[in-house]
């Protein structure tokens, strides 16, 4: 009777939810074995019961039985092991069951997820594995988070979404998580490490499944998400133009249809893209993807010479832009025309959209999928900041961008109901991920603003839009803090800084004035762009967090540097390659690894601490000195000067010692004597003492807000030569 009922239940779930099990052979694993699975909805137990054999027992929570008579039936029956979560003795009882060859199903989380993502995992699962030598099966109920009426989060949901169960035997059960000390603090650390150990493996499994079984390209993702939540608003701009999935698909289809006729054949389908952060930008990007074009996103703040160099490098012949935007920024169109680049204006597209096309797309609202597009097809070309020379063209595939989104959102625990405020430009890798990719792939609403430099306007908009996530650079956050009222950031739940070092003064300022914890992340354009981030689950001050699931890191020894090494990373978010031949050959020689060019340390828990760029080291009297370390030491000691302090450390040639350090600042209170005292009291080597302090009204900066060290060094070298 039990087998017949399970068969009937499986059939019903297949009809309603398209339910399938992948990796079902794992359930035949001999005990002792634990199956741990994400807990997304009230129906999770029914899906698992229909899939597993009668030899599996479900660990249930006794207090849940008090909710109703139906809950009591589910908690107390012959297939369950009810436990009291607050009792430490229950782990011993579970260990006894496993020791006898038992097979237990334990949810990775103690409760149903309240945000749709994997929440805090149970440390006791790893304890049971170590105690009983039990095997571990990782389970992922994909799609259960969208079941309307059965979830506990306010995010996207619908009736009868597709649900699948993916099982995988976890082979990586090693790890020294026992603390040698028996004090309370070390016990808490061990418990935390056990919980993080399980969460890492669960998230890595989720990533593998989503990349293999989910939509493979961004047009496929848009089509899938439109079917799931077509009325959900995913973009809003400063003109309060709102874009839902349905409007996105309609707009992309109509614009794409006209652009297909206007755009000429080009190298690998590349076409220039020059638009600010407005609602039309992501719609135009999807329009280009839907007709098989590769947007080459140009940095309009880089200067016309650099833009011309980028167009030559990418071999583009046309640039999609807006006439009003070109006029607003006084862009030199003639310079591009002289090298054979034509401007295609969106204002000329709308009149060419026929009534028939509008009616057709209203009836058949589906995102077009171009022929031949795959996960490995190039999705966008971005250009590096050029902080160390000529910008390099970076090819990012659909798989790269989707993977980085699927890594970042669950790792940082960003819920569907959150609202992102993004003022970073789309030509910036972080701005593209936050402002375009995450809203498309995850349906998380984003307010996009065209400039991060409007320090007086941005704080008020964050308050007005009730945004919960903001990502920026240290420089921009300091600018906002100068004009913001204490209530402006009251709705912020997650504030992330990347692109440059997060300063202690910024952390203190936001904690004291806005009661907001600013967390530091790390990324590079070549990694789509995010590599690691600190989170509320996993935080270490001074570090840039731990690498995302699916990423590998290694340190390569650098002659002369004893603390740390050159950071190399590998993962599904690492780029396809460079457009620059020399740089691309060097990348391909590393067999999938990417050399970040940063010197870093990685501790036993995996936290990465960036010590500085390889090129940000000076060789003084034969010793390698980190300019970043000296700069950070000075900024930390001068925290009382406030967030308006601009300070950088660079090096110039020196006949006596090879190189000498120079401090450049905008504050007259930073004197030679004060700097020498700080270095002496900090315990740094005497070789770290700067030769002199140079005053400058404003330090040169890149479009991303980072200090332009290359230009700064040229200024210092010119000044040194004159002296």
Task: Name these PLM-found stretches.
Residues 23, 70, 103, 114-180:
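A cross-family acyltransferase "interaction/gating" segment
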Residues 228, 346-347, 645, 659, ...:
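AMP-binding/adenylate-forming catalytic domain of the ANL superfamily
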Residues 230, 343-383, 390, 413-419:
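Conserved pre-ATP/AMP-binding loop-to-beta segment of ANL
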Residues 258-302, 423-425, 624:
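Conserved AMP-binding/adenylate-forming
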Residues 319, 565, 571, 576-577, ...:
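AMP-binding/adenylate-forming catalytic core of the ANL superfamily
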Residues 346, 358, 467-471, 481-540, ...:
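Gly/Ser/Thr-rich phosphate-binding loop
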Residues 402-419, 427-469, 483:
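Conserved AMP-binding/adenylation subdomain of ANL enzymes
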Residues 543-550, 559-590, 623-625:
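Conserved ATP/PPi-binding loop(s) of AMP-dependent carboxylate-activating enzymes
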